[in-house]
Amino acid sequence: MPVAEATTATGLASHNGRQSGVAIGAFDGVHLGHRQVLVGCDTVLTFDPHPMHVLAPRPALRLLSDRRTKLRKLEALGIRRVAFIPFDEGWSRVTADDFVERVVIDRLHASRVSVGANFRFGAHGVGTPETFNNYQSLQTRVVQLVQRGPGAEPISSTRIRKLVAAGNIEDAIDLLGGPFSLPAVAVSESRLVIADEFALPAPGLYSAQVDGNAVSLRTFIEGVVELTHPASLQRDTTVEVSFLNRMA
Protein backbone atom coordinates (compact mmCIF):
# COMPACT_ATOMS: atom_id res chain seq x y z
CA MET A 1 0.00 0.00 0.00
CA PRO A 2 2.04 2.97 -1.21
CA VAL A 3 1.87 6.24 0.71
CA ALA A 4 3.49 9.42 -0.59
CA GLU A 5 5.06 11.68 2.03
CA ALA A 6 5.87 15.38 1.95
CA THR A 7 7.96 17.15 4.57
CA THR A 8 7.06 20.78 5.19
CA ALA A 9 9.72 23.47 5.42
CA THR A 10 9.45 23.35 9.22
CA GLY A 11 9.57 19.56 9.27
CA LEU A 12 12.27 16.96 9.51
CA ALA A 13 14.24 15.55 6.60
CA SER A 14 13.79 12.09 8.10
CA HIS A 15 11.32 10.93 10.70
CA ASN A 16 13.81 8.33 11.99
CA GLY A 17 11.10 6.07 13.33
CA ARG A 18 10.14 8.33 16.22
CA GLN A 19 6.58 8.20 17.45
CA SER A 20 4.20 10.84 16.21
CA GLY A 21 0.81 12.39 16.75
CA VAL A 22 -1.20 11.83 13.58
CA ALA A 23 -4.31 13.75 12.49
CA ILE A 24 -6.32 11.84 9.89
CA GLY A 25 -8.89 13.21 7.45
CA ALA A 26 -9.54 14.74 4.05
CA PHE A 27 -8.98 18.27 5.42
CA ASP A 28 -10.40 19.94 2.30
CA GLY A 29 -9.98 23.66 2.91
CA VAL A 30 -8.25 23.15 6.28
CA HIS A 31 -11.09 25.08 7.93
CA LEU A 32 -11.58 26.05 11.59
CA GLY A 33 -13.10 22.68 12.43
CA HIS A 34 -10.16 20.83 10.92
CA ARG A 35 -7.77 22.93 12.96
CA GLN A 36 -9.18 21.53 16.18
CA VAL A 37 -8.35 18.04 14.92
CA LEU A 38 -4.78 19.16 14.18
CA VAL A 39 -4.09 20.40 17.71
CA GLY A 40 -1.17 18.53 19.28
CA CYS A 41 -0.24 16.68 16.07
CA ASP A 42 2.96 16.90 14.04
CA THR A 43 1.84 14.61 11.20
CA VAL A 44 -1.20 14.59 8.91
CA LEU A 45 -2.50 11.57 7.02
CA THR A 46 -4.77 12.66 4.20
CA PHE A 47 -5.98 11.60 0.77
CA ASP A 48 -5.25 12.67 -2.81
CA PRO A 49 -7.50 12.33 -4.71
CA HIS A 50 -10.37 12.98 -2.32
CA PRO A 51 -12.06 9.62 -1.52
CA MET A 52 -15.42 10.88 -2.77
CA HIS A 53 -13.95 11.32 -6.26
CA VAL A 54 -13.54 7.53 -6.29
CA LEU A 55 -16.48 6.34 -4.19
CA ALA A 56 -19.11 8.72 -5.61
CA PRO A 57 -17.71 10.40 -8.73
CA ARG A 58 -21.09 11.73 -9.90
CA PRO A 59 -21.88 14.44 -9.19
CA ALA A 60 -18.25 15.42 -8.76
CA LEU A 61 -17.25 16.86 -5.40
CA ARG A 62 -15.88 20.40 -5.84
CA LEU A 63 -12.71 20.98 -3.82
CA LEU A 64 -11.98 24.05 -1.69
CA SER A 65 -8.23 23.94 -2.26
CA ASP A 66 -5.50 22.22 -4.22
CA ARG A 67 -2.68 20.12 -2.80
CA ARG A 68 -0.20 23.01 -2.73
CA THR A 69 -2.54 25.26 -0.75
CA LYS A 70 -3.36 22.44 1.65
CA LEU A 71 0.34 21.86 2.33
CA ARG A 72 0.93 25.58 2.86
CA LYS A 73 -1.92 25.86 5.36
CA LEU A 74 -0.82 22.76 7.25
CA GLU A 75 2.74 24.05 7.45
CA ALA A 76 1.51 27.38 8.83
CA LEU A 77 -0.28 25.42 11.57
CA GLY A 78 2.93 23.67 12.61
CA ILE A 79 2.52 20.35 10.81
CA ARG A 80 5.93 18.83 10.05
CA ARG A 81 4.99 15.88 7.87
CA VAL A 82 2.08 15.13 5.52
CA ALA A 83 1.38 11.66 4.17
CA PHE A 84 -0.89 11.40 1.13
CA ILE A 85 -2.81 8.22 0.39
CA PRO A 86 -3.27 7.93 -3.40
CA PHE A 87 -6.87 6.83 -2.94
CA ASP A 88 -8.23 4.50 -5.62
CA GLU A 89 -10.41 1.40 -5.93
CA GLY A 90 -7.67 -0.69 -4.34
CA TRP A 91 -7.47 1.57 -1.32
CA SER A 92 -11.25 1.50 -0.99
CA ARG A 93 -11.01 -2.25 -0.28
CA VAL A 94 -8.42 -1.97 2.49
CA THR A 95 -9.98 -3.04 5.79
CA ALA A 96 -10.12 -0.69 8.73
CA ASP A 97 -7.74 -2.91 10.73
CA ASP A 98 -5.21 -3.07 7.89
CA PHE A 99 -5.39 0.70 7.58
CA VAL A 100 -4.58 1.17 11.26
CA GLU A 101 -1.92 -1.52 11.51
CA ARG A 102 -0.07 -1.10 8.21
CA VAL A 103 -0.34 2.64 7.67
CA VAL A 104 -1.04 4.45 10.93
CA ILE A 105 1.16 2.30 13.19
CA ASP A 106 3.75 0.58 10.97
CA ARG A 107 4.31 3.34 8.42
CA LEU A 108 3.71 6.52 10.40
CA HIS A 109 4.77 5.20 13.84
CA ALA A 110 1.78 6.86 15.46
CA SER A 111 1.45 6.89 19.21
CA ARG A 112 -1.50 9.28 19.15
CA VAL A 113 -4.35 9.67 16.66
CA SER A 114 -6.68 12.65 16.30
CA VAL A 115 -9.86 12.44 14.21
CA GLY A 116 -13.22 14.15 13.88
CA ALA A 117 -16.24 12.51 15.49
CA ASN A 118 -17.77 11.72 12.09
CA PHE A 119 -14.60 10.18 10.60
CA ARG A 120 -15.16 6.88 8.78
CA PHE A 121 -12.55 4.71 7.09
CA GLY A 122 -11.77 1.27 5.74
CA ALA A 123 -13.72 -0.88 3.30
CA HIS A 124 -17.42 0.05 3.33
CA GLY A 125 -16.69 2.75 5.92
CA VAL A 126 -16.86 0.32 8.84
CA GLY A 127 -14.00 1.99 10.71
CA THR A 128 -14.98 4.63 13.27
CA PRO A 129 -13.03 6.63 15.86
CA GLU A 130 -13.75 3.83 18.31
CA THR A 131 -11.81 1.39 16.10
CA PHE A 132 -8.53 2.97 17.21
CA ASN A 133 -9.35 2.02 20.81
CA ASN A 134 -8.67 -1.62 19.87
CA TYR A 135 -4.96 -0.81 19.73
CA GLN A 136 -3.27 -0.39 23.10
CA SER A 137 -0.30 1.38 21.53
CA LEU A 138 -2.53 4.24 20.36
CA GLN A 139 -4.01 7.12 22.28
CA THR A 140 -7.11 8.39 20.49
CA ARG A 141 -8.44 11.95 20.52
CA VAL A 142 -11.92 12.42 19.05
CA VAL A 143 -12.90 15.99 18.21
CA GLN A 144 -16.57 16.90 18.20
CA LEU A 145 -17.95 19.03 15.38
CA VAL A 146 -17.16 22.72 15.86
CA GLN A 147 -20.20 24.98 15.65
CA ARG A 148 -20.21 28.56 14.41
CA GLY A 149 -22.82 31.09 13.37
CA PRO A 150 -26.26 32.22 14.58
CA GLY A 151 -27.76 28.74 14.20
CA ALA A 152 -24.77 27.00 15.80
CA GLU A 153 -24.43 24.96 12.62
CA PRO A 154 -21.38 22.65 12.48
CA ILE A 155 -18.45 23.84 10.39
CA SER A 156 -17.86 21.47 7.50
CA SER A 157 -16.37 21.51 4.02
CA THR A 158 -19.87 20.80 2.68
CA ARG A 159 -21.26 23.90 4.40
CA ILE A 160 -18.44 26.04 3.01
CA ARG A 161 -18.95 24.69 -0.53
CA LYS A 162 -22.60 25.74 -0.34
CA LEU A 163 -21.62 29.24 0.77
CA VAL A 164 -19.14 29.54 -2.09
CA ALA A 165 -21.69 28.28 -4.61
CA ALA A 166 -24.10 30.96 -3.37
CA GLY A 167 -21.45 33.67 -3.69
CA ASN A 168 -21.32 34.20 0.07
CA ILE A 169 -17.55 34.51 0.17
CA GLU A 170 -17.31 36.49 3.41
CA ASP A 171 -19.06 33.78 5.44
CA ALA A 172 -17.00 31.11 3.69
CA ILE A 173 -13.81 32.95 4.67
CA ASP A 174 -15.06 33.20 8.25
CA LEU A 175 -15.39 29.41 8.45
CA LEU A 176 -12.13 28.78 6.63
CA GLY A 177 -10.27 31.08 8.99
CA GLY A 178 -8.46 32.68 6.07
CA PRO A 179 -8.62 33.45 2.35
CA PHE A 180 -10.55 31.33 -0.11
CA SER A 181 -7.88 30.75 -2.74
CA LEU A 182 -7.87 28.67 -5.91
CA PRO A 183 -5.36 28.04 -8.70
CA ALA A 184 -6.26 29.42 -12.12
CA VAL A 185 -4.65 29.36 -15.55
CA ALA A 186 -4.33 32.57 -17.56
CA VAL A 187 -5.76 32.13 -21.06
CA SER A 188 -5.28 35.80 -22.01
CA GLU A 189 -4.03 39.01 -20.41
CA SER A 190 -7.26 39.47 -18.46
CA ARG A 191 -9.02 36.10 -18.52
CA LEU A 192 -8.51 33.09 -16.26
CA VAL A 193 -9.95 29.60 -16.11
CA ILE A 194 -10.42 27.65 -12.88
CA ALA A 195 -10.57 23.87 -13.31
CA ASP A 196 -13.97 22.27 -12.74
CA GLU A 197 -12.61 20.14 -9.88
CA PHE A 198 -12.76 23.22 -7.66
CA ALA A 199 -15.64 25.04 -5.98
CA LEU A 200 -16.32 28.20 -7.98
CA PRO A 201 -18.20 31.20 -6.57
CA ALA A 202 -21.58 31.97 -8.11
CA PRO A 203 -21.45 34.14 -11.23
CA GLY A 204 -20.95 37.74 -10.13
CA LEU A 205 -18.54 40.58 -9.46
CA TYR A 206 -15.95 40.08 -6.70
CA SER A 207 -13.07 41.88 -5.10
CA ALA A 208 -10.08 39.59 -5.07
CA GLN A 209 -6.35 39.22 -5.31
CA VAL A 210 -4.37 37.58 -8.09
CA ASP A 211 -0.95 36.53 -6.83
CA GLY A 212 -1.36 39.12 -4.09
CA ASN A 213 -2.39 42.01 -6.35
CA ALA A 214 -5.77 43.63 -5.68
CA VAL A 215 -8.25 43.25 -8.55
CA SER A 216 -11.94 43.21 -9.33
CA LEU A 217 -13.12 40.25 -11.33
CA ARG A 218 -16.25 38.65 -12.67
CA THR A 219 -16.94 34.93 -12.54
CA PHE A 220 -18.96 33.06 -15.15
CA ILE A 221 -20.08 29.47 -15.58
CA GLU A 222 -17.57 26.78 -16.52
CA GLY A 223 -14.82 28.35 -14.42
CA VAL A 224 -14.23 31.42 -16.56
CA VAL A 225 -12.95 34.48 -14.67
CA GLU A 226 -12.45 37.91 -16.23
CA LEU A 227 -10.60 40.82 -14.66
CA THR A 228 -12.62 44.03 -14.95
CA HIS A 229 -9.59 46.19 -15.77
CA PRO A 230 -6.77 45.54 -18.21
CA ALA A 231 -4.03 43.38 -16.72
CA SER A 232 -0.80 41.85 -17.89
CA LEU A 233 -1.30 38.18 -17.14
CA GLN A 234 1.09 35.90 -18.94
CA ARG A 235 -0.75 33.33 -21.03
CA ASP A 236 -0.61 29.69 -19.87
CA THR A 237 0.79 30.55 -16.45
CA THR A 238 -0.84 29.41 -13.21
CA VAL A 239 -1.79 32.07 -10.68
CA GLU A 240 -3.52 32.07 -7.31
CA VAL A 241 -6.90 33.78 -7.07
CA SER A 242 -8.04 34.77 -3.58
CA PHE A 243 -11.70 35.81 -3.43
CA LEU A 244 -12.45 38.46 -0.78
CA ASN A 245 -16.10 39.49 -1.09
CA ARG A 246 -18.95 39.80 -3.55
CA MET A 247 -19.56 43.26 -4.96
CA ALA A 248 -22.56 42.55 -7.19
Curated annotation (Swiss-Prot):
InterPro entries given for it?
A: FAD_synthase (IPR015864), Riboflavin_kinase (IPR023468), Rossmann-like_a/b/a_fold (IPR014729)
- Provide the E.C. number(s) assigned to this enzyme: 2.7.1.26, 2.7.7.2
Keyword Flavoprotein among UniProt keywords:
yes
- Note the Gene3D superfamilies from the entry: HUPs
- Would I find Nucleotide-binding among this entry's keywords? yes
The lineage's top-level taxon is: Bacteria
Give the coiled coil ranges: none
Metabolic or biological pathway, per its Swiss-Prot or TrEMBL entry: Cofactor biosynthesis; FAD biosynthesis; FAD from FMN: step 1/1; Cofactor biosynthesis; FMN biosynthesis; FMN from riboflavin (ATP route): step 1/1
Q: Which GO terms describe its molecular function?
A: ATP binding; FMN adenylyltransferase activity; riboflavin kinase activity
An example of a Pfam family matching this protein is: FAD_syn
Give the protein's recorded name: Putative bifunctional riboflavin kinase/FMN adenylyltransferase
From which organism does this entry originate? Rhodococcus opacus (Nocardia opaca)
